[in-house]
Amino acid sequence: MSVMSGMDVIVIGAGVSGLTTAVAMSLAGRRVAIFAAEGPSQTTSALAAAIWHPFYQAPDLIYLSRARHTYGAMHRLSSDASSGVSMRPLTEYFRRDAGVPWWADCASGLCRVPPARVPSRFACAYRMDVPVAVTETYLRYLMNMFLELGGRFVPRRIEDPSALLDEVEIVVNCCGFGSRQFGDDALSLSRAVVLRATRDDAVQGCFIDDSDPFAPTYIVERDDDIVLGGTAEPDLTSTVIGQRQIDGIVRRCTRLCEGVAALRIIDARVGFRPVRHSPRVVRDERYARLLHNYGHGGGGFTLSWGCANDIVRLAGEVPSAA
C-alpha cells in the first residue's frame, strides 16, 4: 500500500508553521501527511524563544488578524499543561513614546507602566500578558495532536513541491528558508544568537526592547529555563558565537532586568530566521493546488495559527484535481 493511500494533503516542513498548518488542515477534515527532511527538534523553530510578539512589524491589518488569531489559539492551549504553553507577563520598553502599540488590542491585561518604574533611557513601557511556549514541549504536542488526528509523518526531503501534486490534491510548502531552492529569491537569512539560562526568582516575567533592528533585546521566562537574546544579523551564516557577543547580550538584558546578572548561562545557540519583506501565505502563481506558508522571519510562533487558518481557507478555494 502506498504511504499516501487515503491522504489528500501533503504539508512540507515540520517547524511550527508546518505542524500548525497540518493540525489545522486535519481539524478541517483533511487527511494530511507531513513530508520533512528533519523532525521538529531539528528545525529553526526548536531554537526560538517562542514568545508571542510582533517583532519589527510595521502596522499591518493582515498581520494583526493573524497575530490575534494565534494569540487566541495559544491562550486556549495554555489551559492544557501538556502543551508547554503558558501565559506570562511581558513588559516592553520603548525609546519613543508613540502611544499604545498598534497591536495592543490583541493582548489581554494591557497597562502602561508608571514612569517611576521605567529606566531613564526609555520613554515609556507597557505591560501585557502573552503566550510563551517551551519549544520542545510545544512542537512535540503539535506533532502528537497531528498524529492522533490521523496524520502521517514521512521523513523525506523534497526537491520539487509541484511533483507531489501527482500524489495528492493539495500541497502546502512550509519549508521556511528551504523555499529559496524552489525559486523564491526574496528570502534571506537573519542570524539569531540566543542564550539559555537557569531559572531564578530574580527574573520573573518577560522583557523586550526591540528598538535596535540588529540587536533585539529580550528576556523570556519559560517553565524550565530563561531565554536571553539576541541578534538579527543579515546574511551571516557562521555558527561560531564569540564570548564578546555573549557578554553583550547579557549586558543588554541586565539593563532591562537587573536580576539577569544573577543567572547562570547554560548554553548559547545560533538559529537562522527565514526573512522576507512579508510572509508568503498564498496560492502558487503556476500551480493552483500548491499553497505556500513561509517567510515569517521572527514571527513564526506569533503568526502560526493565523497563517494556518488562512491556508485552510485557501485550500477550500482550490479547484478539484479531477
Located regions from the model:
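Active-site substrate-recognition segment that forms the wall
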Residues: V16, T20-A28, I34-A37, S45-A46, ...
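Conserved FAD-binding subdomain of flavin-dependent enzymes
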Residues: A24-S86
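Beta1/beta-strand and adjacent pyrophosphate-binding region of the FAD-binding site
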Residues: S5-G15
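Flavin (FAD/FMN) cofactor-binding and adjacent substrate-gating region
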Residues: G72-G150, V275-R276
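C-terminal catalytic lobe of FAD-dependent flavoproteins
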Residues: T137, Y141, L263-A322
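A conserved short coil-to-beta-strand element within the FAD-binding core of flavoproteins
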Residues: G151-L165
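Short beta-strand to alpha-helix junction loop
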Residues: P59-H69, A125-Y141, V240-R244, T302-L303
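Short hydrophobic core segments
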Residues: I12, E167-G176, A308
